[in-house]
C-alpha cells in the first residue's frame, strides 16, 4: 500500500529543488512519484511540468497578490501557492478541490499555520483573475522564458523568435523509432492500429512515427521486445546523416542514454560501435537500452576532450558527436531547462564543444564522416561553432548540410514536428 501524500506539496517541493537548488526535474521527480499511488503519478507529473512551463506567470501573480515573498523555511509555501494558481488556470481539477488540496498541502510541509494565508491568496486570485490576466498579457513575463533567453532568440531569429517561444511553451508530441531489424515502419503501424492506437510516419526520417495521442510505453506493441523506442524525430536525424555501414568502426561520443547508439546498430547491425559518455550514472541507461534491444556495443566512461584515455590511438570510420549543449531546442520536453540555464553558460558550452571537436577530429580516418549535433537553437553552439571549426581545420569539409556561410541544418521546434536540433556533416579530406 502506497503512502497517501499530498500531491500539491510534493509538486511544490519538486519545483523548489529545481529553481532554488538547480536540480533537474528528471532526477527530482522519480523518487517523489514513488511516494504516491499509481493513479496519482500522472497528475503529480503534470503539476511539476506545468508549473515549470508557466513559472514566469505564476511568479508574476504572486508578486501582484503578496506584499512580500515567502523566504527561508517558508519558501516551499511560495511554490505551493504557484501549484494552486496552476491548477486554477490550466487544469480540469474543480476549483474547490484545487483550493482545498493546496491549502491542505501546508500541513504536509509542516506549515499548518499558513493555511489561512494560502487560502486567502488563492481566493483573491479567483476574484481578480480577469483583471490580472489582462495585465499579465502585456507584461515582459508573458513569454514564459527568462529575459536573457528571449533576447538571444530575438537576436538569432528576428522573424521567428516568437514562433520558437510559442513552440517551447507547448506540450511535446510523442515520437517513436521503429526498429527496422524487426519490422518495417508500415508493418509496425499496422500493429499499432490493431492495438487501438494511431500513428503518423515522418516524411524525412524513415523510422519515425508520431503517436496521435501519447501513451505509456507498456501499451506499445513489442516495446519490451525491442520493436520500438521512444525517441524524438529530430534526434533520429543523427543516424540518418551519419549513414553507418556494417563492418565500420563507429564512435558515438556523449552517448547516454543510448538512443542514438541503438539507432546506429539498427541501421548497421554489424558495425563495431564504441559508446562513450562522461557521466557514469547515465551510462547505466545505455546498458539498459542495449539489453532491451538485444544489441552489443562497447560502452566506456570518458571525457570527450581526452580520447587517448578511452580509446588509445584507435581511429574510426564515422563519429557521432552529440555535443553537450544548452538544450534550448528541447524546452517543451524539459521546461526546467529555462530555469537551470544561465546566460553565461552559453560561452562556456561553446568552448567545451570546440575542445571536444578539436580532440576527436584526429581520431577520424581520412575519408571518414563526423556528424556534429546539438539539441540547441543558439547559433553560438551551432553554425558559429562549425564555421569556426572549418576555418581552423584545413582537412575538414562540409557535406550535405548547409553552405560554408550557413553551415549545418537547423531544425526549429514546433507543432507536431520534432524538437529543435542542429546537425553538421563533416568529411575528412
UniProtKB/Swiss-Prot annotation:
Catalysed reaction, written as an equation: cytidine(967) in 16S rRNA + S-adenosyl-L-methionine = 5-methylcytidine(967) in 16S rRNA + S-adenosyl-L-homocysteine + H(+)
HAMAP family with a match to the protein in the record: 16SrRNA_methyltr_B
Upper lineage: Bacteria, Pseudomonadati, Pseudomonadota, Gammaproteobacteria, Enterobacterales
Gene (UniProt): rsmB
NCBIfam families: PRK10901.1 (NF008149), PRK14902.1 (NF011494), rsmB (TIGR00563)
Residues covered by region (Disordered): 397-419
Family: Belongs to the class I-like SAM-binding methyltransferase superfamily. RsmB/NOP family.
Predominant place of localization: cytoplasm
UniProt: S-adenosyl-L-methionine binding residues: 254-260, 277, 303, 322
InterPro entries documented for this protein: MeTrfase_RsmB-F_NOP2_cat, MeTrfase_RsmB-F_NOP2_dom, NusB-like_sf, NusB_RsmB_TIM44, RCMT, rRNA_ssu_MeTfrase_B, rRNA_ssu_MeTfrase_B_ent, RsmB-like_ferredoxin
Keyword set, alphabetical order: Cytoplasm, Methyltransferase, RNA-binding, rRNA processing, S-adenosyl-L-methionine, Transferase
Stated name of the protein: Ribosomal RNA small subunit methyltransferase B
Active site: 375 (nucleophile)
